[in-house]
Amino acid sequence: MKYSATIKTRDVDFLVPIPLETKIKADIPKLLKDLGFIINFKGSEGYIRLEHPNLIVEFLVPEKGPGSDKPYKLPHFGLNAQPLRFLDLLIEDTMKVKIEGIEINLPHPANFAVHKLIIFQRRTKEEKIIKDRNAAIEILRALIDKGEVAAIRRVFNSMIPKWQKKVIKGLEETKERGILSILTV
């Protein structure tokens, strides 16, 4: 499958499951400093972001409860993470992919696309709204073309009703009646 620019990014986000079940300790900022990364801080509370001319690395955790604008400390890794809503959706169904000898876990494309349908509605910058919305629709169409309608339905049906309403609202905004009809059967 060939991806268009709507899916490309120079951001790499690492989603850390909570609770973190590891005994491994690694000072990630120190390790990446040798590769030319610098530590930058984002937001009023100082989320750590590792920046390189070609890449930005951020760490995220699923936000639970009433929410907070404070970073979530990850002392095992020498950094902190930004808590964000709806990230549980990305952890629920992952797939292992090997890229240049490195094995990574990625969210299933259906989970990723449905997540984008929810978050584009929360964005404030028009550029990010368009990018997230287009990525969601493009991925969902590709999944439909590949005959993976059941995967899209599975993700949608696994969500709480409040999240389902957000997905439906997003599809209504995009006027994607075909995709909407798949979910509301």
Language-model segments: which ranges?
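Compositionally biased terminal segments of proteins
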Residues: 1-185
